[in-house]
UniProtKB/Swiss-Prot annotation:
Biased composition (Polar residues): 17-29
Disulfide bonds: none
Record-listed E.C. numbers: 3.6.4.13
UniProt record similarity statement: Belongs to the DEAD box helicase family. DEAH subfamily.
InterPro entries in the record: Helicase_ATP-bd, Helicase_C-like, P-loop_NTPase, SNF2_N
Name under which the protein is recorded: Putative ATP-dependent RNA helicase R350
Originating organism: Acanthamoeba polyphaga mimivirus (APMV)
Reactions catalysed, as given in the entry: ATP + H2O = ADP + phosphate + H(+)
Residues holding ATP: 106-113
Subcellular locations according to the entry: Virion
Cellular compartments per GO CC: virion component
Length: 817
C-alpha cells in the first residue's frame, strides 16, 4: 500500500455518519449561503475532500480490466448504457449539492457528449426550467450532438415521439451557439435575451480548448473579441449567480500555453488564478530552457483546482492497436543543403526587414520548412530549386499563399483570382517538368539494366536481416539506380516514405502540412516513379488516394468509405491515403499499418491528432490480433556533418520546430499531469487510467484529516495560499509503502445502561505499526484501534475495537437521471 505525507492509499465505509454536521459554501459575489448536509466545503474543511469522495462515491470505483486469454476486446459485446465514470459525474454535480462546475478531461472514446447529456437530464428532472446553452464548433452540431441527443436525452413517460428529438419538451431548453461563427458573440447574446434568467443556467462548452484558445487569442492580439465577450459574460454570470453551472469538455485541455488552463479554471472558479499570463507564469512556471510546472508550486496548483477536474483515460489501451514509434533523422544531400542554405539566408533577410518595420512576417521559416521536405532538381535554367515560384513574385498575399499550400478551401477575392491562377500554372509547370526529368533518368536506368524497382526489391528482400532502416540500405554499398540517388538528392524523406510504403504489409497513412508542391503533390510523383498511381487506375495494392481541402467534400466521403471498406482491409483497392491539416479532425481510418508524418509541427497536439486518425478505438478489429500493430514514422532532415564555413546554425528548421514543440509539450504535460493527480475521481478510476502510466492521486496527510479543525483545501488569496503547503507534492511530503493486514473491526455507536453498543463487525485494513484503520474497498483512513496497556483492544479474539478519528460527512441516496 502507498502512503503519502502520512496519508494513505487505503480508505472508510459510508456508514460512518455525522448527522449534526452542516456545511456552508459561500459562492463568490453572492450573499446567500448554500447549506447542505453531507458535503465538504473546500474553503472550510476542504482537506477532507479527497477522502470524502472515496467514502460517498465508492460504488463508482472502476474494477481492474481482466481479459480472458486470446479474447479479442473489440469483439466483446457491450450494452449501450452509461458507464460508471459517466454516472459519477452526474451524481457529483447533482443539483442538491454545492458543486456546480467541472472540466470533463475525458479521452477519445469515453462518450463525453453522453456524459454532458446525462447532466442535462439530471438538472431538467430537478428543475424543468433549467436553461442549457451548448457552445460548440459548427462541425459538431449534427455529429455528435444531434445524434447523441437523440440517443441519450431523457423522455417523460407521456412523450410518444421517440424518433424526433427536436419535438421533446426538454429539447426546447437547449440552445446551441457555434463559437467558431463570425457572429458567435451576437448569436450568444441573442440567445441570452430569450432566456428566463431567474431559472438556473448550465453552460456546456465542447472542445473547450478551441474556445479557450480563441479567448487567449482575443486577449493576446487585442484584435478580435467574439470569444472574449462570451467568456466574460459567462464568468460574470458565474460570479453573481449560485445556480450557474459550467461544464467544459476536452480531451486535450491546453494546446499552446498553460495559461489556457488558467483561463479555463478561472471560468469554473472565478479568481482562482492570476488573470495576467505574466503573473501566472511567474508563479507557476519555472524559468529555464525547458520550463515546466514549478515543483515548488505544484501542490498549490493542485489544491486550487480540487473539485474542478474529472479525468478518464477514454477507451482503454487494449482496444487500440499497438503503436511502434520511430523518429527518423535523415541527413540532407549536398544538393538539398545548398538550396536549403539559399532559403535560410533569404528568411533571415525577410525577418530582419520585418523587425525594422516592427512587424513579424507570416512566412516565418516557411521556405526552409518546405526545403526540408523537398527541393526541386536542376532541370534547366528556368526550373530548379533556387527559382521555385514564390507568391511574392506574383504579388499574392502571404496568408493566401500559405493557405493555398496547405490545401485549404479558399474564398479568393476577385482581385486575387487571376493572380492565383497564374501562380497555380507556374507551379503546375514546375511539377510537370520535374516529373519528366525524373522519368528521363528512369528510362536511362532501364537501358543500363538497373532501375529503382530493382532497388526496391533488394530493400524488401533484405529488410529486417541486412537492413533495419531505409537509411541503412541507402548508405550500404552495392549497385544503385541513378534515379534512387537523384530522388534522395531532392528529398530523403519522400524517398524513405516511398520505400517503407512499398514493403508495408497493409494500408499506409501519410500526413504533410503541405498539399501543394513540397508535400502531397511531389509525394504523388515519387509514388508514380515506383509504380503506384491514383487508385482509380492503379494495379492491386499499388493505389493511392488523397483527403484534403482541394478534394470536393462529397468525393472525400466516398474516398474515406472506399478506403475503410471491408474489401480493402489490406489495401488491395487503395493502399495509401495522403492527408493534410484539414483532416486532423473528423476522419477515422481503419486497419492502418504504417503512418508517416512527413514533418514536425509547432504543437505536439497537432501531431497526436494526426496519429489518432489511424489509431482509434477498435479501428483494427478486422485484422487478426497479431497484426494490430501500427509503425509510426516521424521524419526530420538534419544538416550534413560538414557545414558551410558561414553556417553558424547547426539545427535544421525541422529540428528547430520539433524542439519548440517538445518544449511546449513538456510544459503543458507537466500541468496536465498535475490535473490528473488532482482529479476528483483519481482514486476511483485509477484501475483504468493507470493502465499505461502510473502516478499518485492527490490527498492530504493523515495528520491533517484527523484533527478536530481540519482546515480548508486552499486559501482564497493566492499570496496566503503560497504558505499553506499541505498534501501531495508539498515540501515535506513523502511517499512510502506500508504493510497492512485484513481485520474485522467495530466502533461504538451508542450506549445502553452505560454499556457500549458497537457497530456490526466490518472488514478493514489495519496498520499494526501506527494503529490506523482504513476502508477495505477504497483505502481512506477511518480511525485508530484503541490500545489498553499497549495491546490492541478487542471485542473478541477476531474483532478489534476502533475509535473513529476521521469525521467524514455522508450524503445519502442519488439523484434521478
Amino acid at each position: 500500500m502507498n502512503r503519502r505525507n502520512r496519508s494513505n492509499d487505503l480508505n472508510p465505509e459510508p456508514s460512518i455518519e455525522n448527522p449534526n454536521n452542516q456545511i456552508a459554501e459561500e459562492f463568490p459575489g453572492n450573499n446567500s449561503v448554500y447549506k447542505s448536509d453531507g458535503y465538504v466545503d473546500l474553503k472550510n474543511n476542504g482537506r477532507l475532500f479527497p477522502i470524502w469522495i472515496l467514502k460517498n462515491f465508492k460504488q463508482y470505483k472502476l474494477p481492474e480490466i481482466i481479459r480472458k486469454e486470446n479474447e479479442d476486446p473489440c469483439n466483446v459485446q457491450v450494452k449501450l448504457e452509461l458507464r460508471k465514470y459517466q454516472e459519477f459525474v452526474g451524481q457529483y454535480l447533482n443539483p442538491q449539492g454545492p458543486y456546480t462546475s467541472i472540466l470533463l478531461y475525458h479521452g477519445l472514446g469515453s462518450g463525453k457528449t453522453a456524459s454532458a447529456i446525462n447532466l442535462m437530464n439530471i438538472l431538467y428532472n430537478y428543475d424543468n426550467g433549467t436553461n442549457f446553452i451548448v457552445l460548440i464548433k459548427a462541425s459538431l452540431h449534427n455529429d455528435p450532438w444531434m445524434q447523441d441527443l437523440k440517443e441519450w436525452l431523457g423522455r417523460d413517460p407521456s412523450e410518444q415521439n421517440v424518433d424526433n428529438v427536436t419535438k421533446l419538451d426538454r429539447y426546447k431548453n437547449i440552445h446551441f451557439v457555434h463559437y467558431d461563427s463570425p457572429f458567435a458573440d451576437s448569436s450568444f447574446m441573442s440567445v441570452i435575451k430569450t432566456l428566463d434568467l431567474s431559472k438556473p443556467t448550465m453552460y456546456i462548452i465542447d472542445e473547450a480548448h478551441n474556445f479557450i484558445r480563441n479567448v487567449y487569442s482575443n486577449i493576446n492580439s487585442k484584435l478580435g473579441k467574439r470569444a472574449k465577450v462570451i467568456y466574460e459574460y459567462i464568468m460574470k454570470d458565474k460570479r453573481e449567480n449560485k445556480n450557474t453551472r459550467i461544464v467544459l469538455i476536452s480531451a486535450t485541455p491546453a494546446i499552446n500555453t498553460p495559461f489556457e488552463l488558467a483561463l479555463m479554471f478561472n471560468l469554473l472558479r472565478p479568481g482562482i488564478f492570476p488573470s495576467s499570463e505574466l503573473d501566472f507564469n511567474r508563479t507557476f512556471v519555472t524559468e529555464s530552457s525547458y520550463p515546466i510546472l514549478n515543483p515548488m508550486k505544484k501542490n498549490m496548483f493542485e489544491r486550487r483546482i480540487l473539485g474542478l477536474v474529472s479525468y478518464y483515460i477514454g477507451a482503454t489501451p487494449d482496444l487500440y492497436a499497438r503503436q511502434e514509434l520511430k523518429y527518423i533523422n535523415l541527413p540532407m544531400s549536398a544538393y538539398q543543403y545548398d538550396i536549403y542554405r539559399i532559403f535560410e539566408k533569404l528568411e533571415a533577410e525577410i525577418q530582419e526587414r520585418a523587425r525594422r518595420r516592427g512587424k513579424q512576417s507570416q512566412l516565418y521559416r516557411t521556405y526552409t520548412r518546405q526545403a526540408c521536405n523537398f527541393v526541386f532538381p536542376y532541370v534547366n535554367m528556368n526550373v530548379n530549386g533556387e527559382l521555385r515560384p514564390r507568391p511574392g513574385k506574383f504579388r499574392l498575399s502571404e496568408k493566401l499563399a500559405d493557405d493555398f499550400s496547405k490545401g485549404k478551401n479558399l474564398d479568393v477575392p476577385d482581385t486575387e483570382k487571376e493572380i492565383l491562377n497564374k501562380y497555380t500554372k507556374a507551379i503546375e509547370n514546375y511539377l510537370n517538368e520535374t516529373e519528366r526529368y525524373f522519368q528521363n533518368i528512369n528510362k536511362k536506368d532501364a537501358e543500363n539494366g538497373r532501375t529503382i524497382i530493382n532497388d526496391l526489391d533488394e530493400f524488401k528482400k533484405g529488410f529486417g536481416t541486412k537492413f533495419n532502416s531505409f537509411l541503412q540500405y541507402y548508405q550500404s554499398e552495392g549497385p544503385r539506380s541513378s534515379l534512387l540517388t537523384e530522388m534522395y538528392n531532392c528529398s530523403p524523406k519522400m524517398l524513405a516514405i516511398a520505400f517503407m510504403t512499398y514493403i508495408s504489409p497493409g494500408k499506409v497513412m501519410i500526413y504533410s502540412n503541405y498539399v501543394v508542391m513540397e508535400g502531397i503533390d511531389v509525394m504523388k510523383i515519387y509514388f508514380r516513379l515506383i509504380g503506384f498511381n491514383d487508385f482509380t487506375i492503379a494495379r492491386e495494392y499499388m493505389g493511392y488516394c488523397e483527403y484534403h481541402g482541394r478534394i470536393d467534400p462529397k468525393d472525400r466521403v466516398r474516398i474515406k468509405n472506399m478506403f475503410n471498406d471491408k474489401n480493402n482491409v489490406y489495401g488491395n483497392k487503395c493502399k495509401v491515403i495522403m492527408l493534410s491539416p484539414s483532416a486532423t479532425e473528423g476522419i477515422q481510418l481503419l486497419d492502418i499499418r504504417q503512418e508517416h508524418i512527413m514533418e514536425p509541427y509547432w504543437t505536439e497536439v497537432r501531431i497526436q491528432q494526426v496519429i489518432g486518425r489511424g489509431v482509434r478505438q477498435c479501428s483494427h478489429r478486422d485484422l487478426p490480433m497479431s497484426e494490430r500493430i501500427v509503425d509510426i514514422y516521424r521524419y526530420k532532415v538534419i544538416k550534413p556533418e560538414n557545414l558551410d564555413p558561414d553556417d553558424t546554425v547547426r539545427q535544421s528548421t525541422d529540428e528547430y520546430v520539433e524542439d519548440q514543440a517538445k518544449s511546449k509539450a513538456n510544459l503543458i504535460e507537466s500541468f496536465l499531469g498535475a490535473m490528473k493527480e488532482a482529479a476528483v475521481d483519481c482514486e476511483l478510476f485509477k484501475e483504468h487510467n493507470m493502465m499505461s502510466q502510473s502516478y499518485y492521486c492527490f490527498k492530504f496527510p493523515e495528520s491533517a484529516v484527523t484533527k478536530t479543525n481540519v482546515g480548508p483545501a486552499y486559501r482564497e488569496d493566492i499570496k496566503d495560499d503560497v504558505k499553506y503547503d499541505s498534501g501531495l507534492n508539498s515540501k515535506n511530503s513523502i511517499v512510502e509503502r506500508i504493510r497492512v493486514v485484513k481485520v474485522n473491526a467495530v466502533y461504538q455507536i451508542n450506549t445502553d445502561n452505560n454499556n457500549p453498543v458497537y457497530s456490526s463487525p466490518t472488514k478493514y485494513w489495519y496498520n499494526k505499526k501506527t494503529g490506523m484503520v482504513y476502508d477495505f474497498e477504497t483505502h481512506y483512513p477511518v480511525g485508530q484501534v484503541e490500545f489498553i496497556d499497549n495491546l490492541p483492544n478487542k471485542l473478541d479474539k477476531d474483532t478489534y475495537i476502533m475509535r473513529i478519528d476521521v469525521i467524514i460527512p455522508s450524503i445519502t441516496g442519488s439523484v434521478n437521471t
